Amino acid sequence: MRKKNSIINMIVGLVGQLLNMLLSFGGRMVFVHYLSQEYLGVNGLFGDVLGMLNLAELGIGSAMIFSMYRPAAQNDEKQLARLMNLYRTLYRIVALAVLGIGLALMPFLPRLMKGGEGVENLQLIYLLYLLQAVTSYLLSYKNAIYQAYQKAYIRKAVDQIIGIVRLILQIVVLVTTRNFILYLIIQLFMPMLTSAIIWARADREFPYLKQYKELPEPQERKAIFKNVGALSLHKLATVIVRSTDNLIMSAFDGLATVGIYSNYKLVLMNVNNLLGHVTGAFTASIGNLNALEGRKRVYEIFRILDFAAFLLYGYLSGGLVTLINFFIRMIFGEEYLFSMTVVVIIIAEFFISGLRQMGLQFREALGLFWYDRYKALAEAIINLVVSLILVRRFGVAGIIGGTIISSLLTCVWFEPYVLMRYGIEEDWQKKLRRYFMDYIVRWVVVAGVSAVSYWIFQLMPQTNFLWFIVQGLIYTAIFAAVVLTVYGRTPEFQYLLEMTVRKLKKKLRGGE
């Protein structure tokens, strides 16, 4: 059942995300055609401002979901209801905090923008973004019950359908009215509709959530708040690393640069969301496995899933380095391109982040938040300081470079240490050394494939979609050949190959 739910979670997420991805690129094409770069910059900037306000969440969601894995596995309805009551109470407090801080920031908005004079109704635009953040905390907490029961595909299916409708409506509004305010109103209300549907379904499917009104016992709350305390530092790091780039860029380079960068972020966001449905689909299953069977098989499962994540992120990182400018030129135009140096730095940061993902999934599923709490604080400080120093000389490349440097000095070595030392435990030093050897080889593989592919593509035309497909196929062949040569005989590759062949045979025979 664990494996089946993981696969359903993954398939539902992938199909919906593919449709959303196609529509989001279509919507962005319409956006840049009907509105200016400054509006695109505002869209990215305010998104990051609200991302910073999410610091008020303090990691409550992750801590609560981790606490639900065991009672869900044991079907302890009373304990689940108690945890959900606490979740609701905490998220109401968060919503009020976000609203208060968000309103207090309004007078300072003009100081964050350079070149935003041509954008009308800035305060109204900001209020719409703020309302979207506040309502998400008031309405979305019942999603957690599906995550605990490994049924996140139900929430994802609703979210993807409503998301597709939202994108279509936003495209229609831009084409017919060119009105950014109406565009944002749709962006505000459609997620509220998603939450309302999930809320109603959860009440029908889990009626015991209304039956019990009390909160968890004081000792249980203490354990949860301990995890929240650790996760708050992780949340701080995430906010500073992920939500300050556009703020610094806007202040030093202007909204137009933020607009250009937002197109690259759109591509990476869609790729990340796509891959997140694959890696994230296993989080609840890992937590469920740990709750029922302990950590005996955790390392073996980690090796396989971590290798699978490398194949996905490695393949896409190399492809993005060689082809992302070709794609952006075709979709948005020459004026929306960054130099190749900036592109390499952006994708290097994407690959570093990708190689961390499976380790983070295991950390979350195993509840190892406490052990690397100060790492998060160090990462945040280094990122902010280095980005502010480098942006003056190197611009966008300096901002992203700050993120890379902070990751290399903290996350890249300390996160696997925590996982092996406190999650795997047995013979952890040997396993940690093996992890770092694998990490270096993976970088060499992706860098080599990217360099060879880029050199070949410079000898080819970059004029139309057909050549884009041809170059994508050539890159795929090169990557596959190198992976087979380097990893073809490893246990992880053999396991994934055998599992894929077995699934295909079942499908061909009409099996499940």
Where would I find each of the regions flagged by the language model?
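Helix-loop junctions and terminal segments of transmembrane helices
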Residues: 29, 58-74, 147-148, 206-208, ...
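Membrane-interface junctions at transmembrane-helix termini in multi-pass inner-membrane proteins
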Residues: 3-7, 133-161, 181, 347-379
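Alpha-helical transmembrane segments of multi-pass membrane transport and lipid-handling proteins
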Residues: 88-114, 172-175, 299-354, 384-392, ...
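Membrane-interface helix-loop junctions in multi-pass transport and translocation proteins
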Residues: 32-39, 153, 164-196, 370, ...
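N-terminal membrane topogenesis motif
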Residues: 1-24, 78-85, 120-123, 150, ...
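Membrane-proximal transmembrane or re-entrant/amphipathic helices at the cytosolic face
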Residues: 424-427, 451-512
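Transmembrane helical elements of multi-pass membrane transporters/channels
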Residues: 8-28, 40, 162, 186-198, ...
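Interhelical loop/hinge segments that connect adjacent transmembrane helices in multipass membrane
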Residues: 1-6, 181, 198-242, 285-288, ...
